[in-house]
Amino acid sequence: KHVGLQDLSQIHNLNRPKLKFKKFISRPVERLKQFDNNCFAAIRSKDFVVHHPYETFDVVVDYLNQAATDPKVVAIKQTIYRTTADSPIIKALTKAADNGKSVTAVVEIKARFDEESNLALANQMEKSGVQIVYGFAQLKTHAKASLIIRREAGKLKSYVHVGTGNYHPKNAKTYEDLSLFTADEKICKDIERIFNYMTGYASPMKLNDIVLSPPAMRNQINAMIDNEIKNAKKSKPSGIWLKMNSLVDPQMISKLYEASAAGVKIELFIRGICCLRPGVKKLSENIVVKSIIGR
């Protein structure tokens, strides 16, 4: 009989504490302690990156909860791809709307396995006055972004959170992801433009630092790989480190083979399916693929 990875959870549920690791507890974000846990003060001071699950996802929840009750916050724009039925993210957005703030949620109703749940959450938020947008008919809105606009010293100032993982507090305890908090004007302007695009208010404009998929991401990644190939051929330092959910795209795989053959050292961190064959002589001998992070 084949055993799926999910079946292993039944083994873990056995009462054999000596065979198990101690429960892992995410550490608090040290940066916030310097600012009495005031997310906006911390972001205003300097951008910071949070590494989940080693650092707690609570910082993302706190960021939205503080926005929901902050009298200076005038608007929140949020993407929702996958979350929980009792999500504190949803509660924060509805609380913000109840407090009279302009709240927009881009909810993806084509998220696999969560279609029904996302529709129910969208209806719940809409009843509280959250403006709901369902994204594009032919595409999945997979971006993970949150934009908060505050009125400061008579002007509007933007704050942004972007991440590699969903706004899903439970998964964030076991999924390895990165969060960026920033008030950088160029990045904030990019995220504003992307939300305007997703909500149908404007066509996509030229972006400063954010790369949008599908229009531009492939070309950007190819250009970056080409640059490493060029460096390797000139005997300059080169290397590629890529983290992704899966790798099945034939063109991207061919490009990575090309880089490996040119002498570029490549490390791939791939959670799921990987169609690239590492370690093949004269093809992919410079490529290492890792899938599991363990203790």
PLM regions and their residue ranges:
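N-terminal localization/anchoring segments of enzymes in phospholipid and broader phosphate metabolism
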Residues: K1-I240, E258-A262, C274-R295
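Hydrophobic alpha/beta core scaffold segments
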Residues: K265-F269
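Short, flexible helix-loop junctions that flank or precede catalytic/ligand sites
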Residues: K243
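Short, catalytically relevant binding-site loops at active-site mouths
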Residues: L247-D249, I273-L276
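Glycine/threonine-rich ATP-lid/beta-loop region of ATP-binding domains
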Residues: P250-I253, Y257
